[in-house]
Regions:
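Short beta-strand scaffold segments in enzyme catalytic cores
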Residues: 1, 104-109
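Nucleotide/phosphate-binding catalytic cleft detector across ATP-hydrolyzing
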Residues: 2-95, 112-232
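Divalent metal-binding pocket/active-site signature
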Residues: 98
Length: 232
């Protein structure tokens, strides 16, 4: 409540079929669309039935940070929302935001609120699939299972190579960014964060709701701008 998440719903296969029931449970007053793809006509109709003000988050949307990314129109809304979500929790702080999802992204915002950009790397499932699909004989290995220091068969060699490789990659980014920002604090989010949140040295915060927090902050910020404009 307030700025804290109350509930969540996940809908697969590009459908919003469960949204009506969710809206009946929680009567929304306003909303924000942060989709990284274009919505289908069916999705647009479903959202229209909510009959609430809906902000579409685009590269033109006012945001409470300074976006220094050189190609803002190509910047994924989820990346920017993650930055804003972390910044809303730790304002005035140098931050590294690591989002371990389909891809793993590394974003940096400084204590003055300047977002400088970040890097994108293959996520866990993408790495596991690539080893299977781009080789002749390597199997598709599940992420769940033993992760020894050195693999003792092909399955553990692949799993350890991927998961430990990502762990060392994350730790390397933290070390590199802390050399530039000595007081840097780190957030880890994303669906695959649970594979790393207890194993990463110098990891400060984990929060599964960083992106929704950012979208909520953007929505509130635009409401504040509208209210102030009406008072002027």
């Amino acid at each position: 409540r307030g700025d804290e998440p109350v509930d969540e719903i996940r809908m697969e296969n590009g459908t919003l079929s469960s949204l009506d029931a969710f809206a009946n449970k929680y009567p929304f007053k306003k909303g924000i669309i942060g989709a990284v793809r274009h919505l289908t006509d069916c999705e647009e109709q479903t959202l229209g039935r909510l009959q609430i003000p809906m902000l579409r988050f685009t590269s033109e949307t006012p945001i409470p940070v300074s976006n220094r990314y050189r190609t803002p129109k190509t910047l994924g809304s989820d990346r920017l929302a993650a930055v804003i979500g972390a910044s809303s929790l730790k304002p005035g702080t140098d931050l590294l935001i690591i989002d371990a999802g389909t891809c793993i992204t590394y974003e940096v915002i400084d204590a003055r609120g300047n977002y400088w950009g970040g890097n994108i790397a293959p996520g866990m499932q993408m790495r596991l699939r690539a080893l299977h699909e781009y080789t002749a004989r390597l199997p598709l290995v599940e992420a769940e299972g033993e992760v020894p220091g050195m693999g003792y068969n092909t399955e553990t060699a692949i799993r350890s190579g991927v998961l430990r490789g990502m762990k060392y990659e994350i730790e390397g980014y933290i070390k590199s960014m802390r050399s530039k920002f000595p007081h840097l604090q780190v957030f880890l989010t994303g669906g695959n964060r649970i594979n790393f949140d207890t194993n990463i040295k110098n990891l400060i915060f984990t929060d599964k709701y960083i992106v929704p927090r950012g979208l909520n902050r953007i929505l509130d910020y635009n409401e504040e701008l509208r209210t102030n404009s009406e008072k002027a």
